[in-house]
A protein has these predicted regions:
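A short hydrophobic/aromatic micro-motif that marks alpha-helical segments and, especially, helix-coil
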Residues: 17, 145-148, 204-207
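Surface-exposed, interaction-prone regions with an acidic/low-complexity signature
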Residues: 62-66, 141, 145-147, 235-237
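Structural alpha/beta surface segment adjacent to cysteine/selenocysteine redox centers
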Residues: 85-172, 220-221
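Extracytoplasmic/periplasmic, Sec-exported soluble proteins
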Residues: 65-68, 83-88, 113-117, 126-129, ...
Length: 254
């Protein structure tokens, strides 16, 4: 989906850090400002594979695979984006089985607020249960995307606008409820009390907004989700597995 910069900034709702424009304010545009990984798991568990290794990145993403892999793939994605769901369905199984499990490729998913408060609510939910749950919850949310996004489409515009005008400590809980995400999370082991905490966690909210700013600054040619970066370089004009695979194969062979 195309970047809607105004909508992404709208999620800031005055109490959040404002979105920057796409002009980098320091350093060289296109050079990632923070690609470090907080390594809590360096090796596969006994009997497991590199796909069982998940670490958090300093840039606000989650990395599956060998943190020291030769090829580092970054997906800039949105949980509400249908093109991102298509990549999840068509590309991710092969990406994991044929690339990540070899230890030669790591895959970072970095959530991007392409649909403002909608993505914020979804992102906070999938982050809520820690590292090990992130990728399974993200996949499950993609699987059910038509259901929860359908609730948004069916909602009265006045109700959606009212939610977006609430303070952040109320807006994302209300948006999650509108989308049915708290019930969805409860069915997957995240009780409402815990999801309430995540949806009102200012530190997590600030981090989500910072991701938008950093992506816009670090990758000025990024135009929409999904976007892909291989070893720090944005892959131009690629938003599907069919286009990404040749670029990934070339990087592995280098």
């Amino acid at each position: 989906m195309k970047v809607r910069h105004v909508l992404a900034c709208a999620v800031a709702l005055a109490a959040l850090a404002g979105c920057n424009n796409k002009t980098k304010t320091g350093g060289n545009a296109g050079t990632p400002t923070n690609d470090a990984v907080t390594i809590t798991q360096a090796n596969p568990p006994p009997g497991g594979t590199w796909a069982d290794v998940v670490n958090e990145t300093a840039a606000g993403g989650y990395m599956m695979g060998n943190p020291n892999a030769k090829v580092k793939l970054l997906e800039i994605g949105s949980l509400s984006c249908p093109h991102c769901k298509a990549f999840e369905d068509e590309g991710v199984p092969t990406l994991i089985n044929d690339y990540v499990k070899t230890g030669k490729v790591s895959w970072e998913f970095r959530p991007f607020l392409i649909h403002g408060p909608v993505d914020m609510a979804a992102d906070l939910i999938v982050r809520c249960n820690g590292l090990k749950s992130f990728f399974p919850l993200a996949k499950a949310l993609y699987d059910d995307q038509a259901i929860w996004m359908g609730k948004l489409e069916a909602a009265a515009p006045d109700k959606v606008n009212a939610i977006q005008n609430l303070p952040p400590n109320q807006a994302f809980v209300q948006m999650a409820n509108l989308l049915g995400l708290q019930d969805w999370a409860a069915a997957r082991g995240i009780p409402q009390a815990k999801s309430n905490q995540c949806l009102t966690d200012q530190k997590m909210i600030d981090r989500e907004v910072q991701v938008v700013s950093d992506v816009n600054n670090d990758y000025p040619d990024f135009t929409g989700t999904p976007g892909f970066v291989i070893n720090g370089k944005l892959v131009p004009n690629v938003a599907a597995w069919s286009g990404l695979k040749p670029a990934l194969d070339a990087a592995v062979k280098e």
